[in-house]
Regions:
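Active-site proximal loop and beta-alpha junction motif in alpha/beta enzyme cores
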Residues: 1-152
Length: 152
């Protein structure tokens, strides 16, 4: 899916969280592709309900039990080799674009949470919601990694 809410992403919805977490992308090939790629999978989604709501492409989904007690609804990975970032631990622009697409196509409800950064050991959780006007909002907590002052 072509995703563009300012930053451009190629979005992929795959069959399971296990598939997302097992990806070993060729970053040189992704850099040549020239666009950032986001990959996501629903966590513990009822397979039948997703198949019934599939749009023109044939899609088959199966629930994952990779992280059995994880409260999040979606697992996300962001590969941004074209801008010099092999994998980003948590990406607001990607999660917002994914939410616009997945909510519009009925794959996700109007409010859900996503986990990203698991493979990097920098797991983060974001909360996504769509208001009554159709605007998608992204929120979450931050972990400060560095603090300082820049004098210009």
């Amino acid at each position: 899916q072509n995703l563009n809410n300012g930053p451009h992403w190629l979005g992929l919805l795959v069959d399971s969280v296990d598939t997302v977490l097992a990806l070993e992308p060729d970053h040189a090939a992704l850099k040549k592709l020239g666009t950032k790629v986001g990959v996501a999978a629903r966590r513990q989604a009822p397979a039948g309900s997703l198949i019934r709501r599939a749009n023109r492409e044939a899609r088959a989904f199966a629930p994952s039990t990779h992280i059995a007690n994880d409260p999040t609804d979606l697992e996300v990975r962001a590969f941004a080799a074209p801008v010099g970032i092999a994998e980003d631990p948590v990406t607001g622009s990607l999660n917002a674009s994914l939410a616009q697409w997945l909510m519009a196509d009925g794959h996700m409800p109007a409010a859900y949470s996503a986990r990203q950064g698991t493979v990097l050991g920098r797991s983060g959780q974001v909360f996504l919601s769509q208001d009554t006007h159709g605007q998608v909002w992204v929120g979450g907590d931050v972990v400060g990694c560095i603090q300082g002052t820049v004098n210009l």
